[in-house]
Amino acid sequence: MEYSKEDLMEAKKQIWGVGENMGTEESKKIWEENAQFWDNAMGDESNEFHREVVRPKVTELLSPNPADYILDIACGNGNYSSYLAQRGASVVAFDYSKKMIELAKRRQSQYAKQIEFCVADATDRKSILELKRNRAFTKAVSNMAIMDITDIEPLLMAVYELLQESGIFVFATQHPCFVTLTEKYMTPHSYYDIAIEGQPKEQIYYHRSIQDIFNLCFRAGFVIDGFYEECFKTNKEIPMVMIVRLMSACSLCHLQYTL
């Protein structure tokens, strides 16, 4: 089932009690308060969950190389940006938390020639498009942030515009089937929870079904050409994360035509 933009907006109003960008400011305030704790907890190499569950398959699907110009979405303290820089890529990394970007610049200062850190709002298409530089991005990546973003449609639309025709977008997010234990799986809704024990403030999570996420990807012009469901430690049959690779539908058509 595919929802129109009006359907999704009405669902947001009914479940979240908000308009198009409401909720973003509250979420931003929370992340401003959590920024220093998050930077300390994630450090230079990220935490065990990211290192073992998220990063391996994200990197496999992204396949970063020295020729790449990569957009790192909701970059946090920039530890994955530096991981990409270590592999020779040039990176533009952004987050909506000014404090987080300050910490990222400080922590990743040795990669200043390869990484440009910016403050931008992932729910604001215009804000993202202002990250356009002299060349198109070859790739885009988002590690465990889709579920923290109030409205992902502007992000998907903007990323599609910023990528070169053969570009790819890889994102990892909570698996909506197994992390959000709810009787209202099909209904978009938000809730408060923590990501790391001890963080100062509970963050806001935005639950979307797989079909809602994928249909927004398709509507933006993407197709899916890579997908993983990843488990953590002893939960070998319960995937906590899904990792998706998107590419332009036009690029796929061109590829099929040339074959």
Model regions and ranges:
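A short glycine-rich, Lys/Arg-flanked "PGG" loop and its adjoining helix->strand segment in the class I
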Residues: E153-I168
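Short alpha-helix
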Residues: I204-F227
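A short SAM/SAH-binding and catalytic strip from SAM-dependent methyltransferases
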Residues: T138-I152
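Conserved class I S-adenosyl-L-methionine
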Residues: Y3-N65, N79, Y83, L103, F169-I196, ...
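Class I SAM-dependent methyltransferase SAM/SAH-binding core
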Residues: Y69-R125
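A short acidic, Gly/Pro-enriched loop at the edge of an enzyme's catalytic core
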Residues: I128-A140
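Acceptor-substrate binding/catalytic loop of class I
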Residues: T173, I196-Q211
